Amino acid sequence: MPDPSVSRGEVTRLLGALREGDRRAFDRVWDLLYRELRLLARSQLRAPAATLDTTALVHEAYLKLVDAERIDLRDRSHFFALAAKVMREIVVDFARRSHAKKRGGDAVRLTFDETRLSIEREATLVLALDQALGRLAQLSERLNRVFELRYFGGLSEEETAEVLGVSLRTVQRDWFKSRAWLQRELA
């Protein structure tokens, strides 16, 4: 996912400036990573029936992030982890509104294909997945974070390990466990 033309060091330097109170640094980071954020948004909206578009999702995420009282980001991976979390919240809110309009519906069948979901009823699935992730977080916050960062954030195993401060092998085990748990929970 990383754009080779955007240096990790530049993003980290700008995030440091943001921590020091330079609010313009956030806009510069956003400009530098906009293309990658669009790719992240597209992955959040991979369901064929999605009516929320990529640009709207990226812009709504920007508004939520720029208004955050205090953003304490360490590096590019941490930034994408937060952006993924915010985008997931926006997609879930959108699904709730959409689901409220439809009320009801059939049961949802969910299958994992390595890292992607096969979706039959988008709004219902997003809500079911969000509820299951809430239950997973109660069981194990780390399993939940690994799934969220890998699936919603599009982070690699290495980036996920860096963000969470754990070993690569731990991320690999947790990624396997979280997908298996969610598969059982949502079957």
Language-model region placement:
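Short, charged helix-capping/linker segments at alpha-helix termini
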Residues: M1-P4, E20-R28, L39-E60
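Sigma70-family region 2
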Residues: G16-E20, S43-P48, E60-H78
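Σ70-family region 2.3-2.4 aromatic/basic alpha-helix that recognizes the −10 promoter
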Residues: Y34-R38, T55-L63, R76-R97
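Amphipathic alpha-helical segment used for protein-protein interaction
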Residues: L37, L117-R145
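Short, Lys/Arg-enriched C-terminal cap helix and immediately downstream tail that follows
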Residues: A41, R179-A187
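Short, basic/polar amphipathic helix motif occurring as a linker/hinge flanking DNA-binding modules
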Residues: P48-L57, L73, F80, F94-L117
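Short amphipathic alpha helix immediately N-terminal
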Residues: A137-E159
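Helix-turn-helix DNA-binding module
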Residues: G153-R173
